Amino acid sequence: MYTEEPNQEGERRITVNRNGQTDIVAVAHKTPPGLNKDTYSFHLLSKILADGKSSRLQKALIDPGLATSLFMYDFPFKDNGLFISYAFLNPGENHKNIEEIILNTYKEIIDNGISDDELQRAKAQTKASVAFSRDGSYAVASAINEALAIGDWTFYTTFIKKINSVTKNDIKSVANKYLIDNKKTTGWFVSNNNETN
């Protein structure tokens, strides 16, 4: 028997209070199955948002000293997946403020799209990371196996070609379609050592 998760109907939130040293804000949105054409736009969007010193969330959160690090998760699956931004807060920073900055960064792309430079940089980063990840027979076998798990081995062979075909409008369209409240789940990890949030 094979079942599918029902469509999400409205925003979800969770706060975890436990012992720890680093507070975290995570903002997740539902994504389509990995073989959907929007997967490639999501991959590039994750690069634009959080990969490298020129990424938008780096400039919005790391450079001003609001967060110590970022992590973006957008791994494709056979079923629906998640597009998640994680921000690891500097001591004393406010969870709500960090969440708003992440969402405002999304909204800027929803409203105004991305630049040509951002698109080309994201594609170059992707090509480099894919080449590195396919270095060696074990790595190639593992990547093909992942493609099979998603549902089609040609996901491996056509990935870069489809990345190259993504346009600025594709990324803006994906942001408008998926980065919405009805597909959003927000999580806060609040350390018991931090009483400021």
What are these regions (language model features)?
Residues 1-36, 47-96, 118-128, 139-143, ...:
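Non-catalytic beta-strand/loop surface segments
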Residues 98-102:
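Hydrophobic alpha-helical membrane-association signature
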Residues 103-114:
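A common structural junction motif
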Residues 110, 122, 156-157:
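C-terminal soluble interaction/assembly domains
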Residues 145-152, 163:
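C-terminal, helix-dominated tail/subdomain
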